[in-house]
Amino acid sequence: MPFVTASGALPPGYTPIQRVFDTAVWTPGTDRGLPYAAGSVLDFDTGPGVANYQYLLARDALFASDFEAERKRPAANLALQFAPNDTSVYTFEAFYQGYEEEMFNNLHFTFADWWGTLGPNPASTITLYPGTNLIKTRVVGAPFGFNSGDSTKQDTDTFVYALNGKWQLSDAFSLEADLSVQKSEFNTNFIAVRTERVPGSITLDFNSGGGIPSWHFNDDAEMMNAALWNMGQLFQNKGRDEGDAKTITVDGDYAFADGSAFEKLSFGVRYDDRGAIHFQPAPTGSPFLPTPRTLAQMPEGMLWNNKDFFDGANYIPGQWLVPNGYWIQDHADEVRGLYNMPAGGPDVL
């Protein structure tokens, strides 16, 4: 993201290291990005004139995801075979395969772009990569951040039924037929609760080694203080997919007598009917609590903290509090009630 410089001439209306949001000044999403050579300029005159000013480049945010999940794959199979005589065999099979997964994404996110609390000497809060306009390290005062307890629970049930018959109708003629029916359904439910805070400051290095960033707040221990986390928004999503298939195949072989021009005639027919339906989630709001609260004022089961994140690496925070995704999923309607949202979650269309 582009920022104006820390000192020297600044575009009108800007303060040191202010982020440039105006897309009339720069175009996001280009394949080459913006030039990163030292002294590169942007034209801040959005009219016919030219007003070139130097700029800096930096990331606007950092995040860490501490993810865990449990997956199950239940399955069952039944096969029955019946041969009433030497010339016919009937086989029935029923098969079930399931998939169940519950995922908890413990997300820590912090902005690193705020320009309003840089102190009397903003230039002292950053360092650049030599010969570039890329910010390598910086200290940002009062950065907004949030943690989010994201829970996704999803499952698939698939049932297959098949009936097969084989007949030796004569010495020359054999026939085989197969009928199979399949039905599958996939359901997914997502619910998340966010908490927010504004700490005193963050000190960061966008590449502390091997392309991995490093950051610490003025007091990382505050991340474990539930009273310092304000309750944020509730997010919900839901989806369903259904599929079915009906397949009939018939195969036959007829052997001609010796001396015939042809030895064998093989023939077959197949009918396949498949269907699929995708149900979109209905648009759902992302409300705040009707009355502001901190995480400390929420039900005890909602609090969760991790430990030794990233194998205890000392260049990033090692633990933080977050809404417990497992508890939120298990008490989804209770959580929805706190946010004045209807029970059952969003509908699917």
Positions of predicted regions on the chain:
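Outer-membrane beta-barrel domain signature, especially the mid-to-C-terminal portions
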Residues: 192, 202-205
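Short secondary-structure boundary/capping segments
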Residues: 14-15, 107-111, 191-196, 281-288
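Flexible glycine-rich, low-complexity coil/linker segments exposed to the extracellular/periplasmic environment
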Residues: 4, 8-59, 122-143, 204-233, ...
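Outer-membrane beta-barrel transmembrane strands
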Residues: 59-105, 140-192, 224-283, 311-349
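Amphipathic, soluble alpha/beta structural segments
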Residues: 4-25, 175-176, 180-197
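Short, intrinsically disordered/low-complexity patches at protein termini
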Residues: 113-116, 198-201, 210-211, 288
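Transmembrane beta-barrel wall of Gram-negative outer-membrane proteins
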Residues: 1-117, 122-130, 154-164
